[in-house]
Amino acid sequence: MVIQRKYRASRRLGVSLWGRSKDPFNTRNYPPGQHGNMGYKKPSDFGKQFGAHKKFKFYYAISSKQMRNMFLKAYKKKGDTGDNFVGLLESMLSSVLYNSGLVPTIFSARQLISHKHVLVNGKVVNISSYSVKPGDTIKLREKAVNLPPVLAAIDAQEQKVPDYLEVDVKERSVKYLRVPKYYEVPYPANMEVNLVIEFYSR
């Protein structure tokens, strides 16, 4: 299964990235591969930085190039670089939709967006990295509200909806209230943004 392959990231990094019950890491908490059951090696300082970078990359399902561009943008902004960086990541359309709990995974969020099933303030947006602004309302289109993944996500209620989102399950919509700080994001895994900053500052 495609989703199972994507969840391999959790086993490679040694942590349940998305905190989902179907995550193979919950039952096989060792690296994938022939010699995986030998366990995880203690990483070097660079290894820790690279691992932290990978966690964010996989968690948000973005490319290394997108990650770097977002970091550079965050670095140039006034304020705390870590907060700026996480704020940019959490403001992506795919992140807002996933965090709403209306979809089961970040991957399904990106798929619904690319298939033009998502509206932002009443208009179709099919770019997952689209930057949502405070006050924007994201809604699933009529033909998507009863799709199996959507119904399953709502029924499972595995996603902890953060305080900076206002979700209307009945309307299949979510309002983005404000850009969060790093400490406000309810990551299911230990996400060390300070190590990401160190990684890009080498």
Swiss-Prot record:
UniProt cross-references to SUPFAM superfamilies, sorted A to Z: Alpha-L RNA-binding motif
Keywords from the named record: Ribonucleoprotein, Ribosomal protein, RNA-binding, rRNA-binding
One Gene Ontology molecular-function label: structural constituent of ribosome
Short name of any one Pfam family annotated for the protein: Ribosomal_S4
Residue ranges of domain S4 RNA-binding in the record: 91-168
SMART domains, alphabetized: Ribosomal_S4 (SM01390), S4 (SM00363)
Family stated for the protein in its record: Belongs to the universal ribosomal protein uS4 family.
Function in brief: One of the primary rRNA binding proteins, it binds directly to 16S rRNA where it nucleates assembly of the body of the 30S subunit.
Name the record gives this protein: Small ribosomal subunit protein uS4
Gene assigned in the entry: rpsD
